[in-house]
């Protein structure tokens, strides 16, 4: 693995350990060059309560690797999380910088009713 990826994974591991100690439901984000994925994971980490990505049928037809797509994913995951009875989450950015697509997804999820 490249040094950049190793350091990102190390940052992610430290953040997830802290969230595990707090026993918080977490909104986990992963981004690739073409898509973005979001999952709401239970406090013990054993169950995915809600998920959304640019691979979903509703979002697949449009552009998938930009800020607009990340905003749509954020709104969709917030809607699905609220339907599952989750309103408060810890934001797990998976070691990515809080900037660009990751920030757009987080802002849209907040607008959709999730509290961080």
UniProtKB/Swiss-Prot annotation:
Signal peptide: none annotated. It holds the Pfam family Ribosomal_L18p. It comes from the Bacteria. One of its GO terms (cellular component) is cytosolic large ribosomal subunit. GO terms for molecular function: 5S rRNA binding; structural constituent of ribosome. SUPFAM superfamilies: Translational machinery components. Keywords: Ribonucleoprotein, Ribosomal protein, RNA-binding, rRNA-binding. Gene3D superfamilies: 3.30.420.100. GO terms for biological process: translation. This is one of the proteins that bind and probably mediate the attachment of the 5S RNA into the large ribosomal subunit, where it forms part of the central protuberance. This is Large ribosomal subunit protein uL18.
